[in-house]
C-alpha cells in the first residue's frame, strides 16, 4: 500500500497539481493585496475617501452611526455588505483574467510545439513507398528511351 501511495505521489500530474495549488494561494494573496491596498483606496477616493470594502447597509438591528462593518456584524445586526462583495468580485475578475492569460499562453506554446512536431514528422518521413516506386518506374522508362 505504501508503494502504491509512493507511485501515486511520484506521478507528474499530482506534483504539478500541488505546485499549482501553492502558487495559486500565493497569487491569491497578491491579488487580495492589490485590491485591498491599491484598487479600493482609489475607489474610496472617488466615493468620498472611505474604505470601500467596509461599506454596508443595515437591514435589521441597531448599529451606531459610522460603525465599521466588523462592529456592525459583532453587534448582531443584519447587514448588506456590498463593499466586501464588490471587493470579492474585483478579486475574482483579476484572478480570472490572469488565469485566462496563462491558459492562452500555454495553449499558444502547445500549439507551436504541435506544429513543429508535425513539420518534423513530415520532413523525417520522406517519400512514401508508392512515391518511391513511381520514381523508380519513371527512371526506368527514361533509361529505355
Curated annotation (Swiss-Prot):
Chief place where the protein resides: membrane
GO molecular function: mechanosensitive monoatomic ion channel activity
Top-rank taxon, per record: Bacteria
Transmembrane segments annotated in the record for this chain: 14-34, 83-103
Keyword terms, alphabetized: Cell inner membrane, Cell membrane, Ion channel, Ion transport, Membrane, Transmembrane, Transmembrane helix, Transport
Protein location: Cell inner membrane
Translocase in keyword set: no
Membrane topology listed for this record: Multi-pass membrane protein
GO cellular component: plasma membrane
UniProt xrefs under InterPro entries: Mechanosensitive_channel_CS (IPR019823), MS_channel (IPR001185), MSC/AndL (IPR037673), MscL_channel (IPR036019)
Function summary: Channel that opens in response to stretch forces in the membrane lipid bilayer. May participate in the regulation of osmotic pressure changes within the cell.
Matches recorded under HAMAP family: MscL (MF_00115)
Complex and partners: Homopentamer.
Family: Belongs to the MscL family.
PANTHER family attached to this UniProt entry: LARGE-CONDUCTANCE MECHANOSENSITIVE CHANNEL, MECHANOSENSITIVE CHANNEL MSCL
Name of protein: Large-conductance mechanosensitive channel
Species annotation: Paracoccus denitrificans (strain Pd 1222)
Amino acid at each position: 500500500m505504501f508503494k502504491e501511495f509512493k507511485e501515486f505521489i511520484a506521478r507528474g500530474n499530482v506534483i504539478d497539481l500541488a505546485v499549482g495549488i501553492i502558487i495559486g494561494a500565493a497569487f491569491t494573496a497578491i491579488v487580495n493585496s492589490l485590491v485591498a491596498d491599491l484598487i479600493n483606496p482609489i475607489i474610496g477616493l472617488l466615493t468620498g475617501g472611505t474604505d470601500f470594502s467596509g461599506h454596508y447597509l443595515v437591514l435589521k438591528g441597531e448599529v451606531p452611526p459610522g460603525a465599521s462593518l466588523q462592529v456592525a456584524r459583532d453587534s448582531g445586526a443584519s447587514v448588506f455588505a456590498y463593499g466586501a462583495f464588490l471587493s470579492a468580485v474585483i478579486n475574482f475578475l483579476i484572478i480570472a483574467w490572469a488565469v485566462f492569460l496563462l491558459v492562452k499562453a500555454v495553449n499558444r506554446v502547445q500549439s507551436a510545439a504541435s506544429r513543429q512536431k508535425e513539420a518534423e514528422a513530415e520532413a523525417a518521413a520522406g517519400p512514401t513507398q508508392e512515391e518511391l516506386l513511381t520514381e523508380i518506374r519513371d527512371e526506368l522508362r527514361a533509361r529505355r528511351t
